[in-house]
Design a protein with these regions (language model features):
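Local alpha-helix boundary/kink/capping signal
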Residues: 58-59, 98
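Residues at the C-terminal ends
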Residues: 35, 63-64
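N-terminal helix-turn-helix DNA-binding core of bacterial DNA-binding proteins
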Residues: 8-53, 72-85
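Alpha-helical residues within the helix-turn-helix
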Residues: 45, 56, 62-63
Length: 117
């Protein structure tokens, strides 16, 4: 993505960062890694997906400098690069919860309205 009129490098950087987060499995990987480093094998066991899938998602996160890899003997261990990512995920969870509560309220109102007809 290149900057265009009205959009600077910082906005492009932010968009690329959030694009790297825009995958359900990558989000789940990060939710695990904010609690401590893990190997691909450990992530695979927790997530219930195959090793190539986990490795592919970690590669995307590494390319955007969201996670770091550290070799420990023959095992590579992954960790979030910035602990503040846990705060970002927590804020997002609160926003989503409020959105879902609003959606549930709207659905209840629609059901009540449907019953009156």
């Amino acid at each position: 993505m290149k900057p265009s009129p009205g959009i600077g490098q910082l906005q492009v950087f932010k968009a690329e960062f959030f694009k790297a987060l825009a995958h359900p499995l990558r989000i789940r990987v990060l939710e695990i890694l904010v609690n401590g480093e893990r190997s691909v094998h450990e992530l695979q066991a927790i997530l219930g997906v195959d090793q190539p899938t986990v490795s592919q998602q970690l590669a995307v996160l590494r390319a955007k400098n969201i996670v770091d890899a550290r070799k420990e003997g023959t095992v590579v261990r992954y960790a979030v690069r910035d602990a503040a990512l846990g705060d970002l995920l927590a804020v997002a969870r609160r926003i989503f919860n409020r959105h879902l509560i609003g959606t549930q309220t709207m659905l209840r109102e629609l059901r009540r309205e449907s019953r009156r007809r």
